[in-house]
């Protein structure tokens, strides 16, 4: 797997899913995010076995030099992306010995990976979503009627509203 992507694009997608990744993990792979690439898009998945977040971004023509999938440490990847200059172009490559090499300018980082096949997925590929249409006024009214029940401080971030 190999792709070239702007720092801001990768950071934007990564920041959407890193919240679901466990800091203290029971399984090593749960501290990773799953990265999938093809000619059209980059998809990143993060999970803690209760919540799964998936975010995608379109890739420009020629950005994906080799399609593939792997998992990399989420927080380390996030910190590396944050430390790079704003207009940086990141060359992300998975080697044959399953190492993730990130290059940008004079910087070079090597991260360990785990097989993408071992990553736990909560959704199924053929699941069909349900769509509901609600007016803005009705949705606001529903939020106002239930807001009092939201937890203010809870380790399970999805319960805090």
Residue ranges and their predicted role:
Residues 1-161:
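Structural preference for solvent-exposed beta-strand-turn elements
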């Amino acid at each position: 797997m190999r792709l070239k992507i702007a720092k801001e694009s990768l950071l934007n997608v990564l920041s959407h899913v890193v919240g679901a990744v466990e800091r203290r993990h029971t399984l090593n792979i749960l501290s990773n995010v799953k990265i999938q690439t093809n000619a059209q898009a980059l998809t990143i998945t993060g999970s803690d076995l209760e919540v799964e977040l998936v975010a995608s971004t379109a890739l420009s023509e020629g950005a994906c030099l080799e399609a593939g999938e792997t998992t990399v440490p989420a927080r380390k990847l996030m910190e590396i992306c944050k430390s790079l200059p704003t207009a940086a172009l990141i060359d992300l490559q998975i080697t044959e010995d399953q190492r993730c090499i990130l290059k940008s300018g004079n910087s070079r980082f090597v991260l360990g990976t785990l097989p993408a096949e071992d990553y736990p997925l909560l959704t199924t590929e053929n699941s069909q979503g349900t769509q509901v249409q609600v007016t803005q006024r009705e949705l606001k009214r529903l939020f106002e009627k239930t807001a009092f029940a939201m937890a203010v401080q809870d380790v399970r971030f999805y319960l805090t509203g």
